[in-house]
Amino acid sequence: MSHHIDTTEAERTEDASPVTLRDLRRWSREGSVFPCLTAYDATMARWLHHSGVPVLLVGDSAAQVVLGYPSTLHAPLDFMITITAAVKRGAPNAFVMGDMPFMSYHLGDEEAVRNAGRFMTEGTADAVKLEMD
């Protein structure tokens, strides 16, 4: 039986412990349901996290939603890293996943690891997401 996590107001404050991969694993083991929503900037991240959203995805859909491109294929790597850092600054205790854009991991393992590392260091992401065939 699944149940929803209970995020009380106290748990959503800036003083709360950061959401970690260990938390996500525990919630999964317990069958808990938790929200994961997309944010593209610090303000939206702050609102979502204070509303009880523990996991935030910085999606490559920002190419369409923020930059006005016709598809996600146009998401620049540096832009994605920059907005990932903005989301983490807005919600420092949320678990933030940066979405690696098209061609940022397709040309080889070395480049994929380097770009993922940039998301973790420059973008301060807790995890990276990529799409596999």
Task: Describe the predicted segments one by one.
Residues 56-60:
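Non-cysteine beta-strand/loop elements that form the S-adenosyl-L-methionine
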Residues 63:
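Short glycine/proline-enriched, acidic/aromatic patches that form the donor-sugar handling elements
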